[in-house]
Amino acid sequence: IAFMKDWGFDGIDVDWEYPADATQAANMVLLLKEVRSQLDAYAAQYAPGYHFLLTIAAPAGKDNYSKLRLAELGQVLDFINLMAYDYAGSFSPLTGHDANLFKNPSNPNATPFDTDSAVRDYINGGVPANKLVLGMPIYGRSYLNTNGIGQPYNGVGGGGGAGTGSWEAGIWDYKALPKAGATVVYDSVAKGYYSYNSGTRELISFDTPDMINTKVSYLKSLGLGG
């Protein structure tokens, strides 16, 4: 909080990845309540009428968010920034969508997680819809030596640094996508895009401008905060 005061910031965003049990989840709420109290005290003394923001980065994976005290978080926080991305990557056993909106029952391996389930669980858990903010990736996650989405792969490529479009293995800047020779494919059930090159057998999952439009329409329809 002292750092925020010294630099004139508008608030604090807490990124706790992730409370592992009920005790940690309770401690998270206590921490946030204390931060809220100190922000309000600072505002009362130096900026009467001003509301400093308190937000968190929050998981979209059920194993993680099911441990959180959602209703209490919804009360103490201004916004909950949902990390609705990184659903699959180099850490996954199979290729998958990086940030799909929905599950695809006909290809469940491609959608181990989905945004809609997380959003509805947060809301049903007591978080006001207008406090949920949907995170979107501006990069792609790649897989090598694969026959398609939801399939085995071997390697992720990338990581060449400046001028290559990839600063980290398996992750490509949006400006480098789709790569030459790749075909962009839309999964209309999961609501997710990926590119695939049948010659090199490289698959990259990423959000296109059309996908961003779809997500904005989705969050508007549910009254999300942004």
Each predicted region: which residue ranges?
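Mobile, glycine-rich extracellular loop/lid and propeptide segments
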Residues: 11-19
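Extracellular low-complexity, Gly/Ser/Thr-rich intrinsically disordered linkers
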Residues: 177-226
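Substrate-binding surface in catalytic domains of secreted glycosidases
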Residues: 18-174
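Short, acidic/polar
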Residues: 1-6, 62-73, 115-119, 206-221
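Glycine-rich, acidic and aromatic/proline-enriched surface loops and short helix-turn segments
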Residues: 6, 82-85, 180, 186-188
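Short acidic/polar active-site loop segments enriched in Thr and Asp
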Residues: 10-12, 130, 225
